[in-house]
């Protein structure tokens, strides 16, 4: 079913997932398109970003953001067109970056919106390279990782939206960059297109040994966004005073048991102490929101100079969002996962 001018399709949380989300957990509802009142505007969704953090918002465990309530629209960044406006600062046709979630239409009073250039050649980049994923990779690497020329930087999910930015920015800064990805095609893309120095397939039976060979001088910066067995292989290779920015642990988002259970926590703490590691988590807009303009200017410059490559994995149709999201959580996407909701 394509987007209608009369019906608003909304994916809502019907119940909290146990493991991988299903269509019983996330259900499609249809309502009349709402009409804007004074000071409001009607946003029409063009592109929807799918990101791993959304899975955490479906649980009711304590976290850095409040959980979704049952019946809430699934959260998500969006690029929208202003369809109707009763707001003094926005006109019909304006292009905006919003967080209106998994739905065709939404009302907004302008809070949290960011205007985009109406003639932007790749509006979806506002959800990827120039949006939250790119911002996450840039700030985590440069502020916490702070790679120096000649150091070895390792990043998992290297072909993805965050990892690809981490590696390319590290190369610009003169570091040696080793990626970790799943499968030969992704590893080939990482080395041939993104120009990483090496890439290791985490699906390989001898993954840990391959990673060790790819990092003969050890690891100075490990950008953590996966966790689990990948971190197990990285930990012994970390050099003294290595930095570990932590932006996510996608391997744990569906509730799998962590490789570092409570009885192994002393091992991790011992490594942190003996090697004087800096392990720091961060929540991008909470910790670095005021530096977004700095990031946007720099990344736009690099993009214009051809120094940054970025791949999108675009799925057509809001109705396909659930299956696409499931694929994201199991590593099936290749690049920044975007749902094209309308043209």
Model feature map: region roles:
Residues 2-6, 286-343:
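C-terminal hydrophobic helical "lid"/dimerization subdomain
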Residues 2-3, 15-46:
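A short N-terminal beta-strand-loop micro-motif at the entrance of redox/enzyme domains
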Residues 33-50, 58-102:
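Glycine-rich beta-strand-centered segment in the early N-terminal region that forms part
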Residues 74-81, 89-157, 199:
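NAD(P)H dinucleotide-binding glycine-rich loop of Rossmann-like/cofactor-binding domains
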Residues 103-104, 182-190, 207, 264-269:
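Short, glycine/polar-rich helix-capping loops at beta-to-alpha or helix-loop-helix junctions
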Residues 127-205:
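Mid-domain Rossmann-like dinucleotide-binding core that forms the NAD(H)/NADP(H) cofactor-binding site
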Residues 206-216:
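Short amphipathic alpha-helix with an adjacent loop that forms part of the alpha/beta core around
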Residues 229-308, 340-343:
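Glycine-rich phosphate-binding loop and adjacent beta-alpha segment
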């Amino acid at each position: 079913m394509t987007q209608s001018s009369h019906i608003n399709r909304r994916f809502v949380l019907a119940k909290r997932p146990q493991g991988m989300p299903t269509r019983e957990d996330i259900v499609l509802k249809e309502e009349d398109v709402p009409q804007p009142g004074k000071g409001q505007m009607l946003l029409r969704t063009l592109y929807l970003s799918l990101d791993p953090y959304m899975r955490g918002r479906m649980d009711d465990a304590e976290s850095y953001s409040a959980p979704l309530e049952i019946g809430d629209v699934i959260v998500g960044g969006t690029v929208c067109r202003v369809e109707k406006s009763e707001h003094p600062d926005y006109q019909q046709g304006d292009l905006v970056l919003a967080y209106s979630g998994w739905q065709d239409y939404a009302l907004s009073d302008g809070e949290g919106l960011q205007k985009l250039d109406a003639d932007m050649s790749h509006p979806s980049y506002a959800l990827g390279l120039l949006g939250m994923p790119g911002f996450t990779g840039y700030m985590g690497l440069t502020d916490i990782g702070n790679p120096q020329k000649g150091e070895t930087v390792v990043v998992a999910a290297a072909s993805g939206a965050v990892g690809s930015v981490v590696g390319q920015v590290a190369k610009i800064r003169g570091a040696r960059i080793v990626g970790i990805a799943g499968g030969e095609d992704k590893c080939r893309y990482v080395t041939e297109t993104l120009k990483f120095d090496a890439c290791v397939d985490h699906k390989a039976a001898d993954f840990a040994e391959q990673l060790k060979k790819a990092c003969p001088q050890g690891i100075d910066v490990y950008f953590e966004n996966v966790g689990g067995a990948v971190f197990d292989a990285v930990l012994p290779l970390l050099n003294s005073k290595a930095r570990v920015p932590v932006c996510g642990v996608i391997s744990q988002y569906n509730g799998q048991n962590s490789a570092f259970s409570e009885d192994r926590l002393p091992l991790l703490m011992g490594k942190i102490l003996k090697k004087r590691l800096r392990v720091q988590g961060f929540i991008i807009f909470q910790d670095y929101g005021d530096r977004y303009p700095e990031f946007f200017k720099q990344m736009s410059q690099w993009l214009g100079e051809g120094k940054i490559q970025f791949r999108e994995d675009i799925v057509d149709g809001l109705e396909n969002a659930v299956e696409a999201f499931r694929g994201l959580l199991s590593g099936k996407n290749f690049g920044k996962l975007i749902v094209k909701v309308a043209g």
